[in-house]
C-alpha cells in the first residue's frame, strides 16, 4: 500500500533508511532512526514549519524502543512528522528474522534454528501470523486444586512427571470473561506445584482459574514435549534453539519467521510539566513485540479487559474466595494494566495515521494508561490524541486502550492527569486476542471527551467495543453493593464524579465478535458516563451474545439509531447490585431479536421507538445506518498476513 505525499514540502526533511549510518541524515546519506532523533533535537527549538523524518522503504530493527519526550516535540505550533517516504512501506519491528532452519526430528517434522542464547519470547510470527506456542489441551476434571497446585490422576497424564524444563511450563485457563496464565514450579508424584503469587492471585476473586464462571479450554503450554501440531513452536532460551513444526505447504527455506526481542516499540511521553507534543506518525508498520510479564512468577491474573492482578496479597483459605471476598476488594484498587506496544502518556497533539499495528504481543496502543503501564513511568495525561485511517490486526491482546483504572485515572490528584479529547476513527481493527482473549478492539475507561467513530471491528474473541470502567464503585456516592463487599475499607467512597464523560461511539461497523468468550456483547458499558452517546452503529453477529450490554453501574448513556442484526438479546442490563444504574435513553434502534430487559420508566430510563425487524425487511433508516457504518472510502484496506512481512535488513 502506498501512502500519498504531502500537499506541500516541509521546511526540513530528515532522511532515514534501514541501512543508514552517520549523522548527515540527507537524501544522499540517510541515517538511522536514533541519529534522526538526535538531528530533530538539534532543529526543533524554534520551528518555522514542520520537520519531516522520512523513512525509506525496508525493515527497521532498533536495538531499543523509540522514546520521544518534550525534547523531540514540535514548536511554534508546528509538528515533527515521522512518515513513510512516498510509495514506501517502512516497518519498525522489535523482532529479529530467524533463518538457517534444519530438521530436528524427521519423524515429527520438527525443525530448529539457532537464536541468541538468553532471548525469550511468548510470541512467534510466521508468515505474518501469530503462531501457537506448544501446548496440550487437558480435561479440567482430571485435576484437583489446592493452595500449592494441582493433583492429577495417573494413567494418560503420568508423562507430565517427566517433562523437561518444568519451571517454564504454564497453565492457561480460558474462562467466561478472563483468560488466565499461571506458571508451574515443578511436577512430580502426580502433583503440579505452581509458582506464587500467580497461583493465589489467579484463584481468588471472580471467574477464577479453577472455579470459572464458564469453563472454557484448559491448556498446559510451553514444553518441547507438547510440540505435536503443525504451526506450533517452542523456544529453549538457555540453549538458544527455536523449534517449529511447519504448517502444511510451508517451506522452511522460504518461510518468514520473526522472533520478538523488544517488549515495546514506541513510547511517547514527557512529564505533566513538560509533555511530549505535536508529533505525527504516518504510513509506518509497527510490529514484532512480546510482553514477558506473564512469564514471571506473577503470571497473568486477568481481571477485566487488560487489567490484571499482581503482587503478594493476604488471601484467606484457598477455597473461600472463588466468588469474591473482602480481601479481594483490598486488591481491586491496585489492579495493573498490560503495557502496550505503542504508548502515549503525558502528551498532547499526537497523531497516528495511515499506519499498521500488527503482530504485537500485547495491546497495540495504550493512551493515557496508569503509570505502571508506561516505560516512561509517567501515566495518564493524554490530550488531543488521534488514531485514524490505520489497521490493527493479528496480535495477542487488544487494539486501543484509553485511560487508566487506578485512583488517579478517575479522581486525579493533579488535573493535568486527565485524559481528554481522544479521537479513534476510520480504522480497521480485527483478528485480535490470540493469547489474551478477554479484550476488546477499543476501550475507553476514565476519559473526558472521546470519539470512537467510523471504525470496522471484526473477528474478536470477546466484546466488540467498550466504554467505562469501575462497576459504579468509583462514581459519586459509590455503590451499596460494593460497600457490602468491603471495597470502601480499602479506598474512599467518592462523593464527586469521575473523569468519564461525553464519550461517543458513533458509526462503527462491529461484526463477528464474542467468538470465544462469555459475558459480553457487541457494545459493552460499565460505570457512569454523563453525555455518553452510542449512535448509528451496526452490530452484526455476536455468536448469540448481547447486542448492547449495560453492565454494573452503567448510567447516563444514550443509545439511538443503532442496528443489531443476528445478535442475542439486543439490549440487556446487569442489575446485580445495580442500585446506581439507569438514566438511559434507548430510542429508535432496530434489531432482529426483540428481547430486552431494559424498559421504559424503570430507573429513569426512556425506552421508545425501537423496532424489531423480521425477514430482512429493514426500514430505510436502518439501511442508511448499515450503509454508512464503518470506515470511509479513503481508509486503507485491510492487509493479509503475508503482506506485512518485510525483508531482512
Model-predicted regions and their roles:
Residues 54, 61, 67, 81-83, ...:
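Extracellular beta-strand solenoid repeats
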Residues 1-11:
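Secretory targeting and sorting signals
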Residues 331-343, 366-379, 405-416, 434, ...:
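The substrate-binding groove and active-site-proximal loops of carbohydrate-active enzymes
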Residues 12, 49-51, 58, 64, ...:
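The right-handed parallel beta-helix/beta-solenoid scaffold, focusing on the short coil/turn
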Residues 277-288, 324-329, 348-362, 379-397, ...:
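Right-handed parallel beta-helix
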Residues 15-346, 351-358, 372-380, 408-414, ...:
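Extracellular polysaccharide-degrading/modifying enzymes targeting complex plant/algal/animal polysaccharides
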